[in-house]
Amino acid sequence: MAKEKFSRNKPHVNIGTIGHVDHGKTTLTAAISAVLSRKGLAELKDYDNIDNAPEEKERGITIATSHIEYETEKRHYAHVDCPGHADYVKNMITGAAQMDGAILVVSAADGPMPQTREHILLSRQVGVPYIVVFMNKADMVDDAELLELVEMEIRELLNEYNFPGDDTPIVSGSALKALEEAKAGQDGEWSAKIMELMDAVDSYIPTPVRATDKDLLMPIEDVFSISGRGTVVTGRIEKGVVKVGDTIEIVGIKPTQTTTVTGVEMFRKEMDQGEAGDNVGVLLRGTKKEDVERGMVLCKPKSITPHTKFEGEVYILTKEEGGRHTPFFNNYRPQFYVRTTDVTGSITLPEGTEMVMPGDNVRISVELIAPVALEEGTRFAIREGGRTVGSGVVSKILG
């Protein structure tokens, strides 16, 4: 009998495994799918299936990522796992796989390692809001005190990066042992630990707010003048809903303007409203065509503001990815492509950093020559003469 399709009537959450190389991220991903598949909540995925991750291109950057899906009693999950450390860095910075929360895998035998720290920092920088911890390889540690010590270290590390370390759920277990149990058709103590982990994920990582329930944000792609009707701006609604009669703001590049929506159209048909994901034309009352341009955004009043200065976490493409062949230095002036337009800006490198090489990821400060609607979490590309040389995310607004 064919396995029935996953039901879509449960809330959907995006998560991923993060942590140091060889601490068991991929084994845990396989174990979750194996244990849940015994309950009819997932399709069994082999370790090798997950580890041989297909390469994807996101904004010209090659990233190897495995996507699996599974369910718990309460939710439907899409889970990302990356084979290499560089893939995580690229994935998190480009937002190729947005995560509503992450499972941090730490080997109980080794404790936190350099990439453990780096992934927690990246999660903080790119806005992964919640972390649940799986202390893996607990079968290799006989000393209960040692387990407690590792748990304390993890909590301190989370606190250091402004995650609530003291309240974070930490479940210890063995992904490999759970995988072996599930494959042997048993529900043993290690499988129970995987279920305990998924219960923690279910309860600790909140269901994300749907895009349609957020404040309106629509990047403007084009502007037309329709005689006798006024100015129409077109674009894809990123979040929220736009309705006829709404008061909205036009933000970015020029001083902020306030106007009223007099019409919404999709595929040349009049609509009462457009919502997140729709490509629409929005008719604006009393707005002149020359006052609006590509790169501005339509938004709910006061929900997003224009800025020229920000801090960002960026990944610089390698030569093989079509990026620069040479490093860049302080005061480098590329274009920053935010949503629909390029704005020139100058880069200030962190103290003690002389230059940035292709393939590096680094925290930079940027000053743009024109204000753009920005908030923490806004993604951008760094371009030079129309080609992408880097990808980034706003981690902090400076002015």
From Swiss-Prot:
Chain residues that bind GTP: 19-26, 81-85, 136-139
Gene3D superfamilies xref list: P-loop containing nucleotide triphosphate hydrolases, Translation factors
Subcellular location: Cytoplasm
Region annotated G3, chain positions: 81-84
GO molecular function: GTP binding; GTPase activity; translation elongation factor activity
Pfam families assigned to the protein according to its UniProt record, in alphabetical order: GTP_EFTU (PF00009), GTP_EFTU_D2 (PF03144), GTP_EFTU_D3 (PF03143)
GO cellular component terms listed in the entry, alphabetical order: cytosol
G5, as annotated region: 174-176
Region feature (G2): 60-64
Keywords linked to the UniProt accession: Cytoplasm, Elongation factor, GTP-binding, Hydrolase, Magnesium, Metal-binding, Nucleotide-binding, Protein biosynthesis
EC number of this enzyme: 3.6.5.3
Catalytic activity, as annotated: GTP + H2O = GDP + phosphate + H(+)
Assembly and binders: Monomer.
Function (record text): GTP hydrolase that promotes the GTP-dependent binding of aminoacyl-tRNA to the A-site of ribosomes during protein biosynthesis.
Family to which the UniProt record says this protein belongs: Belongs to the TRAFAC class translation factor GTPase superfamily. Classic translation factor GTPase family. EF-Tu/EF-1A subfamily.
Protein name from the UniProt record: Elongation factor Tu
Naturally occurring in which organism (per UniProt): Campylobacter concisus (strain 13826)
Native organism taxonomy: Bacteria, Pseudomonadati, Campylobacterota, Epsilonproteobacteria, Campylobacterales
